[in-house]
Amino acid sequence: MILEGENIVINTGGRPVIPNIKGIENNKNIFLSEDIMNLEKLPKTLTIIGGGYIGLEFATIYSSFGSDVTIIQNEEEFLPREDEDIVNAIRKTLGEKGIKIITGAKITEIESSTVIYNIGEGERKLESDIILLATGRRPNTDNLCVENAGISLNERGGIKTDDHLRTDAENIWAAGDVCGKLQFTYISLDDSRIILDDMNGNRGRTINNRGAFSYSVFIQPTFSRVGMNEKEAMMNNVKYRVVKLPVMAIPKAKVLRKTEGMLKALIKEDGTILGAELFCEESHEMINFMKLAIDNNIKADVIKNFIFTHPTMSESLNDLFSM
């Protein structure tokens, strides 16, 4: 079949990364994020290889169903991109739900549904009913033969694009996960806006003026973040002060009986908000307000005195920015 068009958009998405571990191939006890929800029987025990956001979300899901869940990862540091206090809070909450986390594990082999790994000099075994591979995702560029159109790939194996998502070939754009960049549905949606504007001659919108990047990890409670955290601020020599609020202090959290977590924000001396980290119920809604504030340079004092409805989780931002 041959398809032709005046303009072409490549949006073939991504797929799970399969690590090179002996015993994975043709193992009926190993699942991916794309098929684990099709199980007809709930596993009593589940091992998740990979401690990233996908792994955490599935750990939370299956733990809430009643499975005994263990996360095992090669990296020594758990959630290395996040601030230590946030990581400690998340790890504590996961632990209280019975989710176990093993870091620094060098997995050598999988036998049926048993993970064989080394920590230090000792070999250990982790047995479970099934195993989920959650070791990241990669762009779907195999077999596209994009080189035939003069299109290049980037260092992550995604399609190389400019700020308007144009590829090396005229009138061909790429959007979403296939670009090998931020892999979120809403980023792919915004990619489509950039491309449509570009096709129509409006080149004002680019991938560089989306504003502060926000995301949510749907564990319980949800962890959401936008803008800089402390690690990034220190790395970039940005001066800041930190404000924090325990979720226990939020009236709506008490109504919901969900008082785990903390709220945190970074503020410059002039009141500019650098970033926010919200580990609480409904943070996936609250973070959008924070992105709007950061993108429009709304200062901390404005949010401090903003009139929120009551009782809501959002009104806690009054208290957070009063600290």
Question: Predicted regions: what is each one?
Answer:
Residues L3-G13, I48-I49, V69, L126-G136, ...:
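Short hydrophobic core segments
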Residues T12-I72, I101, E147-A149, L153-D168:
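Glycine-rich dinucleotide-binding loop and its adjacent helix/turn
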Residues G14-P16, G136-P139, V247:
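Short glycine-rich anion-binding loops that position phosphate/pyrophosphate groups of nucleotides
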Residues R15-V17, S152-N154, N202-S214, V238-V243:
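A short alpha-helix-loop-beta-strand transition element characteristic
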Residues P16, G157-N171, K252-K264, K268:
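FAD-binding beta-loop-beta segment adjacent to the flavin cofactor pocket
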Residues N26-L42, K125-N202:
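FAD-site-proximal beta/loop scaffold in flavoenzymes
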Residues M37-N38, P43-T47, Y53-Y117, G122-E123, ...:
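Rossmann-like dinucleotide-binding cores of NAD(P)H-dependent redox enzymes
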Residues F218-N229, M234-M323:
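Flexible, glycine-rich terminal cap/loop adjacent to redox cofactors
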